[in-house]
Amino acid sequence: MIGEERVVRALMSVYDKTGIVEFAQALHNLGIEIISTGQTQRVLREAGIPALPVSDVTGFPEILDGRVKTLHPAIHAGLLARRDVPAHMAELAAHNLQPIDLVVVNLYPFAATIARPDVTMAEAQEQIDIGGVALLRAAAKNFPAVLVLVDPADYAGVLDGLRAGDVPLSERQRLAAKAFAHTAEYDATIAAYLRTEPLPDVLPLAWRKYQPLRYGENPHQAAALYGDFGAFFHQLHGKELSYNNILDTAAAQELIEEFPATEAAAVAIIKHTNPCGVAIAADLHRAWEAAFATDREAPFGGIIAVNRPVDIAFAEAVDEIFSEIIIAPDFAPDALALLRRKKNRRLLQSVRPITGADRWQLRSVPGGVLVQEPDHAPLVAEEWRVVTKRAPTDAEAAALRFAWRVVKHVKSNAIVYAAHDRTLGIGAGQMSRVDSSRLAVWKAQQAGIDLRGSVVASDALFPFADGVEAAIAAGATAIIQPGGSVRDEEVIAAADAAGAAMVFTGRRHFRH
């Protein structure tokens, strides 16, 4: 019966030899003949396990430094022949060929090779597996008759099935799907490494499951994390991150990287991927106090990111409120011990920058994905243009630079009122830019913050003068925005009429 074929002959060719000796010994004990290649065959022979060299099956030696071993009709015919097609089996017999019922293959470590910073193109090319991929695809295509294994974690389950009589068709199909996913990932990694065009005609995606998640944004949504999140963050304490935690962590870290640790200590407080308070100071404790003062309600259950190692003074201050996550480049031992006392708090160490790590941002849409460059353009104040009669003072210019760094991380429509070292009011996600300004002003009033003498940043142009007039009425004396409205002259005139300074950056920072 198809899918219940007896395994008589196995082919083994593995780079990762984890568990291969034990697995091969178990197959041998079941009376299964083993064919093997190169290093795999030597390892098995040294362990006392009979393994027939593949050249004995093909009648052809390995050539070209091992580049050609299994690429031969004697191997692939044995894999591809359908056992339920008499003509196939007769053809095998006519050529004195034998079916191969089990393939155990894993591939050269291309991804690990190109991860080395000093790798050369020639070294990368040497790690592109050809024969192994062909074996996996041939075996997986004929999965009702041929078992295919790419992962040592599956050895034990297959052995259990073989000892019980056979491996059921459903499991054979699962293993075949895993093999095709393995080769797809492998080829996608190679294509990404060799690709030079920025937006290719075909976008191969290959991410391994990093971890399953309890659920997605909401409990009724299934979810998992793919890729290598652990390359950027090490979790030092707390239960596993949720889907929303991961989104907030990325948003918080992306924002805090706007502020180099060499310039000042910086603290960013995030809720639902939006900043609710950002500040810089001589030390983290003072930066925390200023950031928290922006909004004393929203930070509860939020995410805190800092750009310097956490010390005990900062730890004692943030320990007074509940925060889901604290992200820092490091934690002093006494600070770590204190923060670990709350079991529901997660502590993450940021181990490498996320800015610039990904060439592209992806977002799913019906039928596909949207792809764009991340909005990681550096702040270049020299390219800004003063458009009002009055230029910003030095203090206002410093505040404008600070506000512009923050506003790009606020959901559109975004308005940020700020001083040179802290946010004063943040308006996020309103359909009207004027409403975002009103929200920011209201939040500042709720926090008891005086906006007189503040500056205001807008992530996109002011389409009408009313937004600027509202900002000036709230107390702002300088404004930064991209510019580009058909009513720019009207908007500039409103600023001039109030004696305010306005700067055009020429760069928009929509965030949806």
UniProtKB/Swiss-Prot annotation:
InterPro entries: AICAR_Tfase_dup_dom_sf, Cytidine_deaminase-like, MGS-like_dom, MGS-like_dom_sf, PurH-like. PROSITE patterns: MGS. The keyword Cytoplasm does not apply. The keyword Membrane does not apply. One of its GO terms (cellular component) is cytosol. GO terms for molecular function: IMP cyclohydrolase activity; phosphoribosylaminoimidazolecarboxamide formyltransferase activity. It comes from the Bacteria. It holds the Pfam family MGS. SMART domains: AICARFT_IMPCHas, MGS. SUPFAM superfamilies: Cytidine deaminase-like (SSF53927), Methylglyoxal synthase-like (SSF52335). Pathway: Purine metabolism; IMP biosynthesis via de novo pathway; 5-formamido-1-(5-phospho-D-ribosyl)imidazole-4-carboxamide from 5-amino-1-(5-phospho-D-ribosyl)imidazole-4-carboxamide (10-formyl THF route): step 1/1; Purine metabolism; IMP biosynthesis via de novo pathway; IMP from 5-formamido-1-(5-phospho-D-ribosyl)imidazole-4-carboxamide: step 1/1. Its EC number is 2.1.2.3, 3.5.4.10. Residues 1-150 form the MGS-like domain. It catalyses: (6R)-10-formyltetrahydrofolate + 5-amino-1-(5-phospho-beta-D-ribosyl)imidazole-4-carboxamide = 5-formamido-1-(5-phospho-D-ribosyl)imidazole-4-carboxamide + (6S)-5,6,7,8-tetrahydrofolate; IMP + H2O = 5-formamido-1-(5-phospho-D-ribosyl)imidazole-4-carboxamide. NCBIfam families: PRK00881.1, purH. The IMP cyclohydrolase activity resides in the N-terminal region. This is Bifunctional purine biosynthesis protein PurH. The gene is purH.
